[in-house]
Structure formats: C-alpha cells, structure tokens
C-alpha cells in the first residue's frame, strides 16, 4: 500500500499543515537571518534515524522532519520529486532551490543549526553545495554486512542485490570523504560503542550544535523492539541472521572490492 493512500498519511498531512502554520509565525517574527546547514550523509539501514534522533536532542538544532524515519525527502511537497523519482539514479536532477524553499518552511529558523537527513543525499553533495551556504556534512558508515541484512529483511531483496548496493553506498561515502572539505566521517560502531567520543567529535566539528543528550532511550526502528531503547550496537545479532548460503554470495561480491571495506576499517567475514 502506498503511503499516499493510507490513513496514517492523512494524519501526517494534518500534522505537517499545522506545523507549517506555526513555523510561519515563529520564523517570520523570531527567525535567525543566518544558519548552519547540517546534512547527515548515511546510507539506508546504517543508523541514520538513530543519529538524527540523538542530534535532535540539541536545543540549538532543528530537524526538518520529525515523523517516521525523519527524512526531508518524505515531506509532502517534495516526496514525489525526491522519494518516488528514482532517487538512487545519477541521471535524476532535483530542483534544489524549490526543495530548499520547502524545507525552510519546516525548519525552526530560530535555531542556528538546520538539519536534514535524506539517504540519497550521499550522491548529491555537490548539488547541495550549489544551493545551500555554510554547509556541514556528517557522514556515517556501518559494517556492510549489517546493512545487507537490513536491505534483505526490510526490502525483500536478494543477497546479490543487497551486497552490490552496500558497495555502491561505500563508494559514494569514500568519494565524499575525499572530495568534500567540510565533512566529518564517523561509524555506526563508534557511535554505539564509543558514544561520548563520537559526540565530542561532532561537537568539535560543529560547535554551534551545543549540548547533546545520549543517556536516554530512542525510538529509532530496529528489529528487536518497536519501543524505545538506549543506544546499542545491533551488528552482531543482525549479521548472525544472514544465512550461510547468502553469506557465501555476499563474500564473493565483497572480495572483489575488499579495499573498499578496508578503507572504512571493515573486513571480510568468513
């Protein structure tokens, strides 16, 4: 069922409409003139929703979408343009001026840091820089085996497709890390296992973000519970769910670009 046809979608539309009315007054009366734009660059099923929720505990930051997986591309005015329009295809060009105008209506412009999380933006950094000033890119990667498990389980994809897609994402992240100047690369593993160190890196990267809370429970989607839970590394359990026959096929694909895994500190799992 398409979200456009669901009861929940209409509830979301009501929320978005109310939010924009509220933002219209606060932004026009009290909004700042200058902002820092923070873009989370993270492939799907790599912890981006958790990272978004963690950063959103800052009182000096505004996220453009607080519903669901919290992606800016899912806001109603841009959903058909971004989410349903072959977002992972290179030949698709987005009307970024229009997208920015829409996002500005959802951001709380009283905040200094305005944040977006849209997974496909890992392949559109140069386009973003042409439209947004004062940009900061927070890039995060995750063990590709854990990502593959998520793609297979959540999307119903086979092991071959999932493995090739995971490598595609790592290629974009490698390029972003080497080309973009104002970027910070962290890993899902460090975010979960060395949380305070990761948060310190983020605060040093963009000091305006201010205080961030981590010792609370978050509702980011995971396969263990539909409720909230504290920050926890779920990689081991996810990877153990991969069938042996699928692991063999995944390894046959990963071994061809072993250097790419090693670039981010990952290894082939036998």
Q: What are the functions of these language-model segments?
A:
Residues 1-37, 206-270:
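PAPS-dependent sulfotransferases, especially Golgi type II membrane carbohydrate sulfotransferases
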Residues 76, 80, 109-212, 231:
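PAPS-dependent sulfotransferase catalytic domain
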Residues 1-100:
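PAPS-dependent sulfotransferase catalytic core
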């Amino acid at each position: 069922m398409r979200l456009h046809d669901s009861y929940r979608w209409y509830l979301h539309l009501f929320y978005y409409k109310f939010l924009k009315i509220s933002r219209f007054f606060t932004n026009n009366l009290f909004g700042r003139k200058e902002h820092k734009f923070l873009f989370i660059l993270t492939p799907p099923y790599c912890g981006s929703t958790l990272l978004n929720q963690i950063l959103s505990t800052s009182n000096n930051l505004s996220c453009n979408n607080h519903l669901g997986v919290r992606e800016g591309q899912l806001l109603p005015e841009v959903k058909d343009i971004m989410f349903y329009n072959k977002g992972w295809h290179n030949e698709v060009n987005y009307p970024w001026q229009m997208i920015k105008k829409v996002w500005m209506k959802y951001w709380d412009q009283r905040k200094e840091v305005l944040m977006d999380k849209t997974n496909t933006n890992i392949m559109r950094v140069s386009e973003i820089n042409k439209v947004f000033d004062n940009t900061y890119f927070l890039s995060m990667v995750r063990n590709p085996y854990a990502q593959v498990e998520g793609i297979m389980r959540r999307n119903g994809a086979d092991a071959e497709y999932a493995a090739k897609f995971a490598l595609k994402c790592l290629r974009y992240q490698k390029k972003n890390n080497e080309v973009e100047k104002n970027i910070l690369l962290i890993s899902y593993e460090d975010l979960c296992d060395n949380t305070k160190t990761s948060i310190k890196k983020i605060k040093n990267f963009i000091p305006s973000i201010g205080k961030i809370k981590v010792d609370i429970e978050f509702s980011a989607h995971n396969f263990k519970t539909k409720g909230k839970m504290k920050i926890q590394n779920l990689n081991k359990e996810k990877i153990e769910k991969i069938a042996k026959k699928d692991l063999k096929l995944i390894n046959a694909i990963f071994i061809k670009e072993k250097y790419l895994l090693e670039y981010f500190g990952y290894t082939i799992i036998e």
